[in-house]
């Protein structure tokens, strides 16, 4: 089997995790207590969903995941929630005091008390796998636990499981909506670590998803549940080919191979289509061409970033439901002829497609309409650099006055780490600038491009 272990860190990671596992259970017909009436091979078997669930001898299905937080309230909600019997109690790990929005607390002082226990649990899950493929990490980079403990875990996983791929879904601070004053510090410090220790990072941004909820689903005041269910659909589409059988299956490592041209250029934009409410869906014919076009719309992006300001390096289209390869090829051909969607000149093909026959599932009483087919796009675009430059600007304004820095230094961090992380991000912006430049004929050979990477 090609198993995947999910790690949910901090409040954002756990709440996105709740939405994801709720959806996975619905998709596979697994009840909240872990029983699965449709499963014929009790206690194992080589079913495709076993990549995400392990089975006990009694036929109970247990998610291969860990929930970690430095304070108990959010994990307690899982312990008492609808799905409390689904998870093994040892998979829910919580500390006593939180990271207080402080990267240094999550990474150095409080995080390191819990990290060994967490790695122990992850090791147990990994021993249960016959062919562990990699890890999915869910966290927010603006908080303390998600950024600090999340990065600490990624660093330790790189040591223990060097060859396994690590995909990261990170909730990134929005341009206008902020949940903490020190977000810029936490984000810059954690991105510094993400650059090194994760293979693919998918950027999610609450503000962008709020706008999608308002615009496409007519929800006037979206809650985190609305946002997380949308994010869950994206993650479900990405992992559908691991959990179901399809025509063109896509592996976790394949994302990496197809999307990451240089090791540092691994921050992705994601979009999903059709995001449409039940009332509207009734009157629309959502053909493959239509949903493909809407996945490329700037308004569909799950991060506040306009892909028209940059060029695409590669993109992965994951279709699910009633889709045949012929339609996909036609849709992609149309996209290539569009002038608004620009690709870098050194990447002529640029598309990786996956097709899965399992139609998208919707949560009963949720906002999304039940549709026949959907597409999820993960793209690597040079436009994501604007997300970093926005964050760096905010960081600079605060750091010029050394505001709030004493909280970090007091937790055992050195001031040098701030400037080191900031320089790393400046270099990243530069890298993105360089990959977007047109290559002049014949200069690529003799110039040593090997230095930067």
Curated annotation (Swiss-Prot):
GTP binds at residues 11, 71, 144-145, 179, 206, 228. Its EC number is 3.6.5.-. CDD domains: alpha_tubulin. The keyword Zinc does not apply. Keywords: Acetylation, Cytoplasm, Cytoskeleton, GTP-binding, Hydrolase, Magnesium, Metal-binding, Microtubule, Nucleotide-binding. The active site is at 254. Pfam families: Tubulin, Tubulin_C. Signal peptide: none annotated. The modification N6-acetyllysine is found at residue 40. InterPro entries: Alpha_tubulin (IPR002452), Tub_FtsZ_C (IPR008280), Tubulin (IPR000217), Tubulin/FtsZ-like_C (IPR037103), Tubulin/FtsZ_2-layer-sand-dom (IPR018316), Tubulin/FtsZ_GTPase_sf (IPR036525), Tubulin_C (IPR023123), Tubulin_CS (IPR017975). GO terms for cellular component: cytoplasm; microtubule. Belongs to the tubulin family. This is Tubulin alpha chain. It comes from Toxoplasma gondii.
């Amino acid at each position: 089997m090609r198993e995947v272990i999910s790690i949910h860190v901090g409040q954002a990671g756990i709440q996105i995790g709740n939405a994801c596992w709720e959806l996975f259970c619905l998709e596979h017909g697994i009840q909240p207590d872990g029983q699965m009436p449709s499963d014929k091979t009790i206690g194992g078997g080589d079913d495709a969903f076993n990549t995400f669930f392990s089975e006990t001898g009694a036929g109970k299905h247990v998610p291969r995941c860990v929930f970690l937080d430095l304070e108990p309230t959010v994990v307690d909600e899982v312990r008492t929630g609808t799905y409390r019997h689904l998870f093994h109690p040892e998979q829910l790990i919580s500390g006593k005091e939180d990271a207080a929005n402080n990267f240094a607390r999550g990474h150095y002082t409080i995080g390191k008390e819990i990290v060994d226990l967490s790695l122990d649990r992850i090791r147990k899950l990994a021993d249960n796998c016959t062919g562990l493929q990699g890890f999915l990490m869910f966290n927010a980079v603006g908080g303390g636990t998600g950024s600090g403990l999340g990065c600490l875990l990624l660093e330790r996983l790189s040591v223990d499981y060097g060859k396994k791929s690590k995909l990261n879904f990170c909730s990134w601070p929005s341009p206008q909506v902020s949940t903490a004053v020190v977000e810029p510090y936490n984000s810059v410090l954690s991105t510094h670590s993400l650059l090194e220790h994760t293979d693919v990072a998918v950027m999610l941004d609450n503000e962008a998803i709020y706008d999608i909820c308002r615009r496409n689903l007519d929800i006037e005041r979206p809650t985190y549940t609305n946002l997380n269910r949308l994010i869950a659909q994206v993650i479900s589409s990405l992992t559908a080919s691991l959990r179901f059988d399809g025509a063109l299956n896509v592996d976790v490592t394949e994302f990496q191979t197809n999307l990451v041209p240089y090791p540092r250029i691994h921050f992705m934009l994601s979009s999903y289509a059709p995001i449409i409410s039940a009332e509207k869906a009734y009157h629309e014919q959502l053909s493959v061409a239509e949903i493909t076009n809407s996945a490329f719309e700037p308004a569909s992006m799950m991060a506040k970033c306009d892909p028209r300001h940059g060029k695409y390096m590669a993109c992965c289209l994951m279709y699910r439901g009633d889709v045949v390869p012929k339609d996909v090829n036609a849709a992609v051909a149309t996209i290539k002829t569009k002038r608004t969607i620009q690709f870098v000149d050194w990447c002529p093909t640029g598309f990786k497609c996956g097709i899965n026959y399992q139609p998208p599932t919707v949560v009963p009483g949720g906002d999304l309409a039940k549709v026949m087919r959907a597409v999820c796009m993960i793209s690597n675009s040079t436009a994501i650099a604007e997300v970093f430059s926005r964050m760096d600007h905010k960081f600079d304004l605060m750091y010029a006055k050394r505001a709030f820095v004493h909280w970090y230094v007091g937790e055992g961090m050195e001031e040098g780490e701030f400037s080191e992380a900031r320089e790393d991000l400046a270099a990243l912006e530069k890298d993105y600038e360089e990959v977007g430049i047109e290559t002049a004929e014949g200069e690529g050979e003799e110039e040593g491009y090997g230095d930067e990477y």
